[in-house]
Amino acid sequence: MKAHKTVFNQHPLSLNKLFFVLLLIFFLPPASPAASVNGLYKDSQQLLSFKAALPPTPTLLQNWLSSTGPCSFTGVSCKNSRVSSIDLSNTFLSVDFSLVTSYLLPLSNLESLVLKNANLSGSLTSAAKSQCGVTLDSIDLAENTISGPISDISSFGVCSNLKSLNLSKNFLDPPGKEMLKAATFSLQVLDLSYNNISGFNLFPWVSSMGFVELEFFSLKGNKLAGSIPELDFKNLSYLDLSANNFSTVFPSFKDCSNLQHLDLSSNKFYGDIGSSLSSCGKLSFLNLTNNQFVGLVPKLPSESLQYLYLRGNDFQGVYPNQLADLCKTVVELDLSYNNFSGMVPESLGECSSLELVDISYNNFSGKLPVDTLSKLSNIKTMVLSFNKFVGGLPDSFSNLLKLETLDMSSNNLTGVIPSGICKDPMNNLKVLYLQNNLFKGPIPDSLSNCSQLVSLDLSFNYLTGSIPSSLGSLSKLKDLILWLNQLSGEIPQELMYLQALENLILDFNDLTGPIPASLSNCTKLNWISLSNNQLSGEIPASLGRLSNLAILKLGNNSISGNIPAELGNCQSLIWLDLNTNFLNGSIPPPLFKQSGNIAVALLTGKRYVYIKNDGSKECHGAGNLLEFGGIRQEQLDRISTRHPCNFTRVYRGITQPTFNHNGSMIFLDLSYNKLEGSIPKELGAMYYLSILNLGHNDLSGMIPQQLGGLKNVAILDLSYNRFNGTIPNSLTSLTLLGEIDLSNNNLSGMIPESAPFDTFPDYRFANNSLCGYPLPIPCSSGPKSDANQHQKSHRRQASLAGSVAMGLLFSLFCIFGLIIVAIETKKRRRKKEAALEAYMDGHSHSATANSAWKFTSAREALSINLAAFEKPLRKLTFADLLEATNGFHNDSLVGSGGFGDVYKAQLKDGSVVAIKKLIHVSGQGDREFTAEMETIGKIKHRNLVPLLGYCKVGEERLLVYEYMKYGSLEDVLHDRKKIGIKLNWPARRKIAIGAARGLAFLHHNCIPHIIHRDMKSSNVLLDENLEARVSDFGMARLMSAMDTHLSVSTLAGTPGYVPPEYYQSFRCSTKGDVYSYGVVLLELLTGKQPTDSADFGDNNLVGWVKLHAKGKITDVFDRELLKEDASIEIELLQHLKVACACLDDRHWKRPTMIQVMAMFKEIQAGSGMDSTSTIGADDVNFSGVEGGIEMGINGSIKEGNELSKHL
C-alpha cells in the first residue's frame, strides 16, 4: 500500500485519472452496457433501413428483423456488442452502390465489408458524400457491375484507415482527368483485375494517388499496354500484370527486396530478362508464361523460388544450369513450349521438393534420363511429351509413389511397356500417356494394378496381342484410348465394369468378334469409336440406353443386321458413322429424335482431328473423327498404312454446338452398306446436320422435300442408289451446301438452275436421266412427243442454232468494234493523262485466280480506268470458306479490324488466301455489296491487295484476298516478336514508297477517284518481298453502301490517323488520305504508334513530333535506325519533311500523292537509293496535274523552309 501511495504522490494526475475510473466502475455501472445497447440498436436500425431500401424480394435477407438482434442477421458478425463485419457475397441485392455508402459505410464499428457478386451497379463517387467508420479497413466489391473511372477510388478518402480494396471483375475504366488528386488513405491491397482499364500507363497514376505502400497489386485481365516505368513500391510483395497487352521489355524494380509473387503471363513482353530479378531475394512465384522472351534463362533468386513458369516463350539453349541452384526450393517447374535442346542434366534429380515438371514441346533429346527422374520422390506431375527422347520406359518409375500424371507422348521411346509400372499397391498414378511412340509387345496385365488410373492412352504405337480383360477392374477409368495399334482378339466383356468410362477409342486395330452388348452398362460413355477393325455381328440395341452417347463410330467393319431404332434414344448423339459394313433393312425413322443435348465431358480437355476423305473409289466414307491428344499431326502418314484414303483436309479442334432447334446430329454416314427403302422424312428435321452420306446403298423412292430442312448441311451424298423422280426444289434453300453427289440413280427432270446447283460439276449428276446445266443435255420445254411437236422441236432447234450463229457473228463484230474504240480512247487518254499511265501497272498480280471462275452479272458502281480485267472475280460458296477456315476457328484467325475478322485459309485448289468476314449487315445492301465487289475486284496494282473473290449468304459477307506473308506493317513495326523480322531503313523506305504508290493509284487512276478513308499501318500489308500492299481500299464506301451499324466516325478513319478537318465535317477527301499517309510515314521514321499514352500522354504521335520540332528534331527518329547507320540521318530528315507536308493542318496545302512520289524521287536522285525502292520516271510524271509543292534537290520544301512551319 505504501508503494502505491508513493506512486500516486509522484503522479498526482494519474491519481485523478484512477479516481475518475473508479467512479465510472462503482457509481455508474449501468452506463457502459446501455451505451453498447444503444450502439447496437443504432446498428440494427441502419441495417434494417438498408433492407427497406432494397427491391422487395421475399427471400432476400429474410431474418433481418427488428425482433432479433443484428448479430444474428445473415452475413453479419459482431465484436464487443457492435456490428464489425458484413458479408453479403452472392446475395442478389440489385441496387446502386449509393445505397451501400448511405447505410453500410457509416456503421461506426465496421471493420470489414464484403459485397462480392451482389449485383451492385453505379459508380464509386457516392462514397465521397458519405461518412465512414474509422475502423473500416477492408472493402470487397468484386464481381459486380460498378462502372466509372478508377480515379473514383479517391472517393474512399472518407475511410481514412482503409487498407484493402477489391474492385476486381467490374467495369471500371482508365482514370479520368478531373480526379487525379492524391488519396487521403494509404492502401496496402488493391485489386483491379478484370475491368475495362486500357491504353493507360497506370503506374504513375498509382504513385500520384499516394499508394506507395502497396503490398498487393493486381491488374490482371485488363487491356493495359505500352511501356512500364521503373517500379518504386518498396513494400510490394504481390504483383500480377497477367492477361494484358503490355508489349515492352521486362519491367525494372527500384527495390524488389520484398517481392514474393510476380505474374507477367499472357502479354507480349519481349527481349532478354537479364539480371532484372537478381535482387529479388524473397521471390517465390514467377510466371512468365505466353510472352516473347528470348535468349537464355537468367539467374534467378535461389533462396526462395518455389514456382517457376516459363511456358510459351522463345528461351533457347540447353537445359539451364542455373536452374540447378533452385533445386532446394523449387516445387513446380514449367519450361514447356520453348526451344530448349540437348539432354536433361542429372542435377534435375536433386530437386527433392519438385512436384511438377513440364518440359514438353521442346527439342530435348538423348536417352530418357531414367535415373535422374527416378530420384524425384515427391513428383506428382511429369510431362516430357513432344521431345525427341529415346530409350525405354523403366520399372523404376513405380517407386515414385506420389506420381499422378506421367506424359511421355510424342517421343521416340521403344521397347515394351514395363509390367511393373504400378507394382507398388500404394501407387497413385491417375494419368498415363504413352501415345505416339514406338512401343511394341502386349499391353501388360499388371496395368490393372494402377487402381487410381483415370486416363490411359497408348494409341499410335505398335502394340500387339489382346486387350487385357483385367483392365475391367479399373473402376475410376474414364478414358481408354488404344487406337492405331496392332491389337487383336475380341473386345473384353469385362469392360462392362468400367462404370466411370466416358471414352472408348479402339479404331485402326485388328479386333474381331461382336460388339459387347454389355457396354450399355457403362452409362457415362460419351464416345465409342471402333472403326477400321474386323468386328462382326449386329449393333447391340442396348446401346440405345446410353443417354450420354455423343459419338458412335463403327465404320469399316463387317457388322451386319439392321440399324437399331433404339439408337434414336441416344438423345445426345451428334456423330453416327456406320459406313462400309453389311447393314441391311431400312433406315429407322426413330433414329432422328435426338433432343439437342450434348454431354459436357465430350468437349472438355480433348483434342480432336477430323480427316476428310478424298472421295476415291478405294476410300469409303466421308471422313474420320479421331482423338488426337498427344500426337504430332505430321504422324498422320502412319494412318495410310491402315486406311486407303488420301486426306484432302485435316481439321483440328471442335466447336461446341449450341442447339436451339430439334435434333443434335451433325454427322451421319451410312454409306457403303445394303440399306433399302426410302429416306425417312424425319431426317429433314436434323437442323444441325452438316454431313449426310447415304451413298452406295440400295435406297429407292423419291428424295423427300423435307431434306430442304437441313439448313446447315455442307456435304450431301446420295449417289449409287435407286432414287427416282426429280431433284426437289427445296434443296435450293441449302445455302451452305458445298458438295453434292446425286450420280448413278434414276433421277429425271431438270437440275435446279439456281444456287447452289449452278456451282457443282457435271459428274455429280451423271448416270441419271437429268438435263440442264451443268450437264451437256438441254431440257425440252414440255413433255409432248407427237410428230408435230417433234417437227416444231426441230424447227426451234434450227432456229436456235441460227440465232446462236448470228449471235456469235454479231458478237465478233461488237468485239472488233470495241477493240477499235478502246484503242482510240486509250490513245487520247495517253495524250491527256500521260502523268498517270505508269500507275496502271495494268497486269493482275494475282496468281491464284482460276480461269474457270464465273463472271457475275452485277452492274458496276464505278468506271475503272483499266486496260483489261483478265480474270473474272471468283464467287465462292459459304461452305467452301467454312471448310477452308475450319469453321472460322480461332486457329485460323490472323487479325481483326473495324470491318471484321481476317482468317488465313487454303482453298481446294491449294491457293492460300486471306478471308475477311465482315460485320453482319442488313439485307438492304445486297445489291450495293455485289456492285462494290465487282468494282473492287477489278482494281489491280502491285501495291494494292487484290480481291480474289467473295461470298454472300444470309447476313454473312466474306471477301477473299491474296494472302500476304508478313501481315501488316503495324505488326511488323510494333510487334516485332510476333512476326520475327526487323525492318532496317532500306526496308522501311521501300514500304513508304510502295504504300504511296498504291494510294496514288487509287487517287489518280480510278475514275471517279477512290478515297481510302482509313489509311493506317494495319492496312499496309507486306508480301514475301516486303513490298507494301494497301488493303481495305473501298471498304468504308462498301460498308456505307450496305447500311451497316457502323458510325460515321468509324467509316472516316482511325484515331491517330484522322485529319483535323474530319472533326468539323465527316466529308472525306483524298487530302484526308494524304494526312493519314503522313502518319504512317511518321511511324516508319519514329518506330512509334500513332496513339500511345505511355509515350505521348494525352497527345499523339503528330503532336509529339511537333513538340520536338522546336528542339532537336533528330530525337524523334527510331534509335535503332541510327544505331545501324548514322549516315542516314540526312535522308531521314528529308523523309520527315515529306511527312510534315502531308500533315499540314490546312488540307489545301497538303501535296497530292503524285506530288509525294515526286518528292521521293527527288530524294532518291540525291541519295543513291538502292534498286529495291527505285521510283521510275512515270511514277512522278504529272503533267496536267494542278500545281502544288515543289521540292529542291536538297529536300527543302519551298512552301516553307523551316520544318517547324510544316508542323
Swiss-Prot record:
Transmembrane region(s): 803-823
Q: Glycosylated where?
A: 119, 166, 196, 235, 245, 287, 339, 363, 412, 449, 521, 556, 584, 646, 662, 724, 746, 767
How does it sit in the bilayer?
A: Single-pass type I membrane protein
**Transmembrane helix as UniProt keyword:** yes
> What effect is documented for mutating H1012Y?
In cu3-abs; brassinosteroid-insensitive semi-dwarf mutant
The UniProt record lists the EC number as 2.7.11.1
A Pfam family matched in the record: LRRNT_2
Can you give the residue ranges of the Protein kinase domain? Answer: 888-1163
Per its UniProt record, what SUPFAM superfamilies does this chain match?
Answer: L domain-like, Protein kinase-like (PK-like), RNI-like
Q: What is the enzyme's class at the highest EC level?
A: transferase
Keywords, alphabetical: ATP-binding, Cell membrane, Glycoprotein, Kinase, Leucine-rich repeat, Lipid-binding, Membrane, Nucleotide-binding, Plant defense, Receptor, Repeat, Serine/threonine-protein kinase, Signal, Steroid-binding, Transferase, Transmembrane, Transmembrane helix
So what does this thing catalyse?
A: L-seryl-[protein] + ATP = O-phospho-L-seryl-[protein] + ADP + H(+); L-threonyl-[protein] + ATP = O-phospho-L-threonyl-[protein] + ADP + H(+)
| Record motif Cys pair 1, residues | 71-78
Which residues constitute the catalytic centre?
D1014 (proton acceptor)
What name does the UniProt record give this protein?
Brassinosteroid LRR receptor kinase
Q: Which organism is it from?
A: Solanum lycopersicum (Tomato)
Gene coding for it: CURL3
